[in-house]
């Protein structure tokens, strides 16, 4: 029995059919709608602004 049928686990993480643009991976998740945003275990980075790195505690600017 699947507790959450809308969630589909894959080898590297899982996908949620309700939000196809979000793809969770082992290290975090990526959002295909916003490819410049990449979530990681500790927060997220924005490739458009590499100097900005969001973390669990807030954000840092290199």
Swiss-Prot record:
Q: Name one GO cellular component term.
A: plasma membrane
Organism domain of life: Eukaryota
| Marked site: Not methylated | 14, 29, 44, 59
Lipidation (S-farnesyl cysteine) occurs at 14, 29, 44, 59
Topology in the lipid bilayer is annotated as: Lipid-anchor
Which cell locations does it reside in?
Cell membrane
Q: Which UniProt keywords apply?
A: Cell membrane, Lipoprotein, Membrane, Pheromone, Prenylation
Q: What does this protein do?
A: Rhodotorucin-A is a mating pheromone in cells of mating type A of Rhodosporidium toruloides.
Descriptive protein name: Rhodotorucin-A peptides type 1
Q: What is the lineage of its organism?
A: Eukaryota, Fungi, Dikarya, Basidiomycota, Pucciniomycotina
Q: Which gene encodes it?
A: RHA1
């Amino acid at each position: 029995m699947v507790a959450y049928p809308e969630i589909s686990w894959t080898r590297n993480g899982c996908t949620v059919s309700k939000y196809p643009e979000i793809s969770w991976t082992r290290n975090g998740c990526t959002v295909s709608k916003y490819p410049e945003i990449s979530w990681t275990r500790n927060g997220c980075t924005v490739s458009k602004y590499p100097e900005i790195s969001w973390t669990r505690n807030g954000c840092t600017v290199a």
